[in-house]
Amino acid sequence: MDGDALFPRVDAVADSFTAEYRKGALTDSAQLGRLRDRLKTLEDSARQYAVSNELDRILTENGAQNLNASTGNDATNYFFSLPSNRAKLWFVLESDRIRNPVLREFYSEREVVLEERRLRVETQPFGMLLEEYLAAAFRAHPYGRPVVGVASEIQTVDRQAAQEYFKRFYGPNNAVVAIVGDIDVDSMKAWATRYFADIPTGEPHRPVVTQEPPQRGERRIDVEYDANPQVLIGYHVPSARHPDAQALAVLSQILTGGRTSRLFQRLVIRDRVATTIASFQFPGSLYPRLFTFQGVPIAPHTTQEIETAVYEELARLTREPPTDEELQRVRNQIEASAVQRLASSFGVAFQLSNSEALWYDWTQTFRDQAAQSRVTAADVQRVARAYFDRGNRTVATLVRPPKPATGGTN
């Protein structure tokens, strides 16, 4: 862990801690892919001398709030807030959690992850559609694998495999820690050295070498589920570090960013075709990803009407540049979003740790915001022409299954 970029925020009475590990779904092999989900739910069992939920109890008794964890394709995060005079407690507990992982409740937590998959994917229309969509779009790259895994993987991984996985990746060399609040920088550095310096390093994060081959034609899938229809439309685009990434972010805001955006005005306000129209780049940032549109029609309107509107507005951007008013609106949105993210200690900590973990540079997030503000109309047109063609497109539609034929007797 690097302590060279510690800055106090003296207006905060509590400290927000985020620990982000450079390992996400892309670090996982097919067999070990779901271990990180169980590991993050086993925090309260990872101390040899602890009873059930002991870590949670200690933190709560010392005033901790907002204890949570998240995991994605690129990284795994742990975060909570502590009173400023309890900051040392984080170093004590986190270092012991890494040094002495005892996964006492592994098998019960395995059932928790299975249930999480059932709730978020197998019985949730959007989750099911999203999983099939990513599998269709990514034939080679691990971004096509579900973050929560598949049931057969979850059911067959044992505690020994989890222990080995933990030792491989949960080391100080893979951790980025952001501490924001009324802190003493010298104390933070001293505690980091005292509690983490003698912990063995884990296996260093290695980039994924598999590259998704160019798509050679539109891909379409129908996902049958008894729910209201919706559609995902995706185009392969570069990673968040590519020079075009910021222009693509601005294009997204022009089309779906807020009530005054083009597609929202057309589909939701004017024509009343859809309840939802959104766009986003995912499922990660480190590698080439998907620029995705999500649309949910209002009956009796159809997903095809949403598709038509999306394609027409993309084509319009290639012919007609966005107006100065649209670009200024996007700049205002970028600035407002940046202010909101930095309004709390947690927001600052999460943003800094995420930027350092992914890009090895905690200032990158601020440079990205500045770059978005410099995007021109010509930049937006250029990326609209470069990426949004039919051959680069994957479309996944949620459809109701056909009703079974009814028989009769004469």
Name what the model sees in each region.
Residues N100, V185-D186, P238-H242, P300-T303, ...:
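Short beta-strands and strand-coil junctions in structured, solvent-facing domains, enriched
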Residues K88-W90, Y107, T123, A190, ...:
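Solvent-exposed, non-transmembrane alpha-helical starts
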Residues V185-K189, P243, T303-E305, R393, ...:
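Extracytoplasmic/secreted cell-surface and envelope-processing proteins
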Residues D96-L103, Y195-E203, Y311-P322:
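A common structural junction motif
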Residues G3-N85, L119-P172, D198-H242, Q253-T302, ...:
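Non-catalytic beta-strand/loop surface segments
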